[in-house]
Amino acid sequence: MPLIDMPLSKLKTYKGISPRPKDFDAFWARALKEMRGTDPRVELKPAAFQVPFADCFDLYFTGVRGARIHAKYLRPKKAAAPHPAVVQFHGYSGNCGDWSSKLEYVARGYSIAGLDCRGQGGESEDSGGVKG
């Protein structure tokens, strides 16, 4: 995306240069149907890492095709309900990062879930049953 050579008004409507696949809508209809038919089986386990101002958990849920997904979930101890949250995704060959890298968000009143994307360097499984 050309961040510096296009005015903001054009950036707001910019759609890239790759054509939209012909099966785009059908693909997403199938994917959403599969996701909605998946029982997430959410587990929230207290983490070994703890700090005085945050509750820290290992969060697990089942994604499509049965893969177990892991996230580091932290929330402020005195959080109002509802309150803002951040969902953090890492780049390829990475993982969700260290617990301490998420504390800044919690200190500002945000919950944060740092996901281990499937098939990468963390605890999540891919649909082939591989961890990491």
Regions found by a protein language model. Give the residues of each.
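Active-site-adjacent helical/loop segments in soluble small-molecule enzymes
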Residues: 28
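N-terminal cap/lid segment of alpha/beta-hydrolase-fold proteins
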Residues: 33-81
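Cap/lid segment of the alpha/beta-hydrolase catalytic domain
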Residues: 97, 103-132
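Secreted/periplasmic carbohydrate-active enzymes, especially glycoside hydrolases
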Residues: 1, 17, 21-24
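Short, hydrophobic/aromatic alpha-helical segments in well-folded domains
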Residues: 88, 100-101
